[in-house]
Amino acid sequence: MTPAKPSVDMEPAYENHPTGANKPRIDAHKVRSQAYSAMLAGAAGHGYGSLDLFWFYKDADGPFPKDGFQHWRKAIAYEGSRQVGLMRRLFEQRPWHKMVPDQSAIALEQGQGTQRLVTARAKDGSFVIAYLAVRLQEVSGVSDWPI
């Protein structure tokens, strides 16, 4: 579109949503990869969703788990919601609104789906944010940065 218009990904995959008979439910990895993919592609925002929060099951609806679903109090602490919150803090510490998508910063094959590598950089080149999955248990001396 010209001119470019802001977009917000408000309907990503909901955490713990079924994906079909005998298939795994949407997990934190899928939630996280969709969030980073949207933001690093230039989205103006990203919404988090949990199917269990959508249903808002309460004590009277139990016992839980009920058909694979959880009480809303458990769902509010799902790992995907925590990780999307960490992503928010990461982006808020930088002028993320000055970022542009830049796949040229990736030296590897970009991959597909939840294994897709995505990057964006500041227009002035002062920083890059890249999303890639890493098995930290395979790395010695792992440290983290306060977000």
What residue ranges belong to the model's regions?
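Aromatic- and carboxylate-lined catalytic core of secreted/periplasmic carbohydrate-active enzymes
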Residues: 7, 15-17, 31-147
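Active-site clefts of carbohydrate-active enzymes
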Residues: 1-31
